């Protein structure tokens, strides 16, 4: 984990309750993405979630019939979800074991989490996610559109968070290079209308499920 990522995790750790309160409502774009995922996978499909945060997305995914393994790199989020009665693993997708004793996952869901991964580390993370996803399994992830990287001290929490920004062609290329095919990129505005998000979906090995 880079020093920037460590500082970002500390910020989330300090402001976890505030973050959960401010992000409690599922945006329409996220709901639509989860509905597409559930429709393609079918009931009971196993999903690895990277960056569960307050658990909002996982709850909706389960309502849609999916089985979700919750994970986060921030201890406060993991503790919060466990207090609510959910299983949640403290997990860094860059270095920790992502596998499951039940075999490969049917999909990976990484909403607004991999944008904190350093540019040079994202290929490794995507490789590792592909390795634990079945052939034909799905990837859904979101990044912020832009150039370079930088710190933010505004938004859902006040503490400093480090973001890596991506242009669509570069994001698509790094996803493809990690063993994912049929990449689709959708653009959408954030909740405040001031930032453009990239929603990427892809298929493991380019095989339709």
Regions found by a protein language model. Give the residues of each.
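A short acidic, Gly/Pro-enriched loop at the edge of an enzyme's catalytic core
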Residues: 96-108
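Short alpha-helix
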Residues: 162-178
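A short SAM/SAH-binding and catalytic strip from SAM-dependent methyltransferases
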Residues: 106-121
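Short, glycine-/aromatic-enriched active-site segment of Class I SAM-dependent methyltransferases
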Residues: 144-162
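A short glycine-rich, Lys/Arg-flanked "PGG" loop and its adjoining helix->strand segment in the class I
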Residues: 123-135
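Conserved beta-strand signature within the Rossmann-like core of class I S-adenosyl-L-methionine
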Residues: 136-143
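Conserved class I S-adenosyl-L-methionine
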Residues: 1-42, 147, 189
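Class I SAM-dependent methyltransferase SAM/SAH-binding core
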Residues: 48, 54-97
């Amino acid at each position: 984990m880079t020093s920037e990522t460590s500082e970002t995790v500390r910020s989330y750790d300090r402001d976890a309750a505030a973050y959960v309160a401010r992000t409690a409502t599922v945006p329409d774009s996220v709901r639509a993405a989860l509905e597409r995922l559930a429709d393609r996978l079918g009931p009971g499909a196993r999903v690895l979630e990277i960056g569960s945060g307050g658990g909002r997305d996982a709850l909706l995914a389960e309502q849609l019939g999916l089985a979700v393994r919750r994970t986060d790199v921030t201890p406060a989020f993991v503790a919060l979800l466990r207090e609510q009665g959910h299983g949640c693993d403290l997990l860094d997708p860059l270095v920790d074991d992502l596998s499951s004793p039940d075999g490969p996952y049917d999909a990976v869901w990484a909403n607004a989490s991999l944008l904190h991964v350093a540019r040079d580390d994202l290929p490794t993370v995507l490789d590792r996610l592909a390795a634990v996803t079945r052939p034909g399994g799905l990837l859904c992830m979101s990044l912020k559109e832009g150039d370079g990287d930088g710190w933010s001290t505004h938004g859902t929490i006040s503490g400093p968070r480090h973001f890596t920004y991506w242009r669509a062609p570069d994001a698509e290329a790094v996803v493809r290079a990690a063993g994912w095919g049929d990449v689709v990129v959708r653009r959408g505005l954030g909740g405040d209308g001031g930032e453009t998000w990239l929603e990427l979906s892809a298929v493991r090995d380019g095989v339709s499920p």
